[in-house]
Regions:
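Feature captures hydrophobic
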Residues: 1-165
Length: 165
């Protein structure tokens, strides 16, 4: 199990994306001739509700380092059906991306569990998108697969971890 929005989680997610043949096919051409990289902006992480010492040491370090004022940022580098990189960052100005998808932590949990479709969630304003929505719509199947792939990552959510004694 890996803790959501940590280095371990993003690395596992990257591996799972690259192992998915259906994603590779549906995302062919994504990011070719344009920047297809994303920042996932996870807002309102309830850090005050996370039990003390609940995280494994590396996840606790990541949460302390990468969650700033209740917000975390994850970079997903996507090109032509592959995920070439995935990692958390402190400041979104550190990288140039073509797209930023923003939303509250509770909505990200639903998306990471494949309880909502990303396109429907964007259209329903559960998330905001900075970037060319027409390009995202053209690759709607790939976007939906990214959500279902995230659900296959064995994930622990920071606010659902029991306190360790």
């Amino acid at each position: 199990m890996v803790v959501f929005a940590t280095k371990g989680w993003t690395e596992e997610y990257r591996k799972m994306i690259n192992q998915n043949k259906e994603y590779k096919e549906s995302a062919k051409g994504w990011g070719v001739g344009f920047n297809g990289d994303f920042i996932f902006q996870i807002e309102k992480i309830p850090v005050d509700k996370i039990p003390p010492k609940a995280h494994p040491a590396d996840a606790a370090k990541d949460m302390k380092e990468f969650v700033v004022n209740g917000t975390a940022y994850m970079v997903l580098q996507l090109k032509d059906g592959e995920c070439t990189g995935a990692y958390p960052i402190k400041d979104p100005k550190q990288v140039k991306v073509g797209f930023v998808m923003k939303g509250p932590y509770e909505n990200w949990k639903k998306l990471a569990r494949a309880q909502v479709d990303p396109i429907k969630a964007l259209l329903g304003r559960q998330f905001a998108l900075e970037g060319d929505m027409a390009k995202v719509m053209k690759y709607a199947k790939a976007a939906s697969l990214l959500a279902s792939i995230s659900a296959s990552v064995k994930t622990e959510f920071p606010d659902e971890l029991p306190a360790k004694k």
